[in-house]
A protein has these predicted regions:
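Carboxylate-rich, polar loop motifs that coordinate divalent cations or form catalytic acidic clusters
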Residues: 1-177
Length: 177
């Protein structure tokens, strides 16, 4: 990684907070948490490594967190409320700003399709507080409702399966303002 003060490249093994780690899986996604300053590294088959200057790196996996649906992390997104959304090769989860974890299980769409396994590639939240997911296998998924009240969640799918898109593979998504 690049050292901010000097601009020089530094191997992670030479960063004190990373000492003790033998090796790291391939990096897939990264985000810096706005309030805490933590940097979350989403890894291919390695979960999430949480870096906070001056502290030993924390390693989050499906075994020690309630929001990871798979250890293959493919997308990270922090919304304006401070909730950190995590897309994986297997689903979507969120660590709320208050530390509460939520894992999305089966999503039932209003056109009788359902999804228990999705490969999330990108995540964005719009001004209406809706979450949009780009997926490799189910096109775009639109989530409305309050994640703090799971019974209010509703899901809509835009994909080749329901003829709302010409493909099921969507790699990124952007909010047009």
């Amino acid at each position: 990684c690049r050292e901010y003060e000097t601009g020089k490249l530094k191997m992670y093994s030479h960063i004190p907070e990373f000492s003790g780690l033998k090796d790291l899986p391939s990096l897939f996604a990264v985000t810096q948490r706005k309030k805490s300053g933590e940097i979350w590294f989403g890894m291919y088959n390695g979960g999430i490594y949480v870096y906070r200057k001056g502290e030993k790196v924390k390693h989050l996996t499906t075994k020690n967190s309630g929001f990871l649906t798979s250890d293959c992390v493919s997308a990270l997104y922090e919304d304006y409320e401070g909730n950190c959304w995590v897309g994986t090769r297997g689903g979507i989860g969120v660590r709320l700003a208050d530390g509460t974890d939520y894992r999305f299980e089966t999503m039932n769409f209003n056109d009788s399709l359902s999804a228990g396994w999705i490969y999330v590639r990108d995540i964005i939240k719009d001004m209406d507080n809706s979450v949009w997911l780009a997926t490799s296998n189910l096109g775009v998924i639109h989530i409305t409702g309050d994640v703090r009240q799971p019974s209010t969640l509703k899901y809509e799918n835009y994909s080749f399966h329901n003829r709302k898109l010409i493909t099921n593979t969507v790699l990124c998504i952007h909010l047009d303002r």
